[in-house]
Amino acid sequence: MISSASDPFSAISSNFLCGKELNAIKVNLLKERNYPEIFDGFGWCTWNAFYKEVTSRKIYNKLDEFKEKGIKIKWLLVDDGWQQFDDRKLLSIKEDPVKFPEGLKAFTQKVKEEYGVRYVGVWHAFEGYWAGIHKDGELYKTHKDMFFETPTGWIVPGETEEKAFKFWDMQHSYLKEQGIDFVKVDNQAAASNKYDNILPGATAASILHTAVEKSVFKNFNGAMINCMGSKMENILTRPKSAISRNSDDFYPNAEHGFITHIVQNVYVSPVHNQIHHCDFDMFWTKHKTATVSAVLRAISGGPVYVSDEVGNTKAEQLKPLVTPNGDIWRFENAAMVTKELFYTDCSKAEVPLKVWNKSGDNFVVAAFGITPDKTVKGSFKLSDIPNADDKYLVHDFFSDRYFILKSGEKIDLETEYNACALYSLYKIADDNTVKIGDKTYYAEGADPNPKTVLLNDIL
């Protein structure tokens, strides 16, 4: 299918809608997927804090820090490292008793009751673990009927939907009994390769995604984060799960990691967001890119969470991002590059990378400096975003200034490397009133409780 439109976003959307109407796309489009309420709150993930050396004691230490600093987190994700594995292969569906000596159920109870964290989730791989299931482990010996041995010797979830579902339902039912509320399912793009010479890749992906989602919806009401699965055979075979990681990992020690991260996210999202709400991944609040990372997550339209090490969460970085009760304000789409930069490498072109999103009649636009060690200049016009009106009230977040922007006018931009500008655009009603959000938040344009003011009273 080929679509023609006045902007690339409309053309891409038209293609997906047409594909759905022709039954070429057999899974739900974005509007048919329900965003889990869990991820309307602020979260913390163990990954960049502990990597595979995660333990319950270390997690309690981090939660003590959040408590002392008055930071409310709504959900906690225990990432890779909590399970029993050997040689990158899964031994059991149960937690590692050395790392979680009190047991997973007692751990989740303590996290919820003593620390006030409402939801706890865990990570697991699509194949069981990175290299599948261990042949000498309790899991395989007891439940061989749920698995499939490939011609190359991998032990993976069964090659039929029924067998794969039996495995994941067993695992997820156990996790649910321990108080787990959601899962992150990782390494999805590589999974179908394990079934080479047995099933076509797209068929294998469809079987696996259908089976795992059937279990997730049975046990967790659909609350999951899909991860490492941006191949189209993954995106187009997930029946109805809502959230999918939109980029490679956040790498805190990569010298210019933010460039790669933002470019992947805002250029992939125009396609990915046709099916899924996009997860822009975690970040650190104590980091040279903390502010730009927080702004990007605030306007991303997806989950907002950090992975700070113990002692390293900077509460002041979270104040414009998270409400005191741990809520976040989400825009309705995934954040995307502005249309005139759709085919531009902003880092090499030495211009600000402009990113937009919307909430109802409001827009948000951020301009990021992503050319190393250089200050870059550019401009923003209303024509840079699709379907904008002729006039808006604009709030410049970092200078705390309100002004009017009309069609044909421009905002001059000048951004340093690892810095950004942020503008909220408010629709002006016929009676010259404007519904404005709380200007102390990056996502003010998505404030669920805006106040109505007269234009003359704010300019």
Segments from the language model and where they lie:
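Extended acidic/polar, glycine-enriched regions
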Residues: 1-30, 35
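Aromatic-lined carbohydrate-binding/catalytic grooves of carbohydrate-active enzymes
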Residues: 37-199
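Flexible loop/turn segments at secondary-structure boundaries
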Residues: 50-54, 83-86, 127-133, 190-194, ...
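Alpha-helix-loop-beta-strand connector modules within alpha/beta enzyme cores
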Residues: 104-114, 203-224
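Glycan-recognition surfaces
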Residues: 133-177, 210-315, 336-337, 345
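Solvent-exposed beta-strand/loop surfaces of large extracellular or lumenal domains
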Residues: 186, 391-408
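Carbohydrate-binding surface patches
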Residues: 297-300, 305, 343-390, 418, ...
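Short strand-edge motifs at loop-to-beta-strand transitions and within beta-strands
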Residues: 409-413, 421
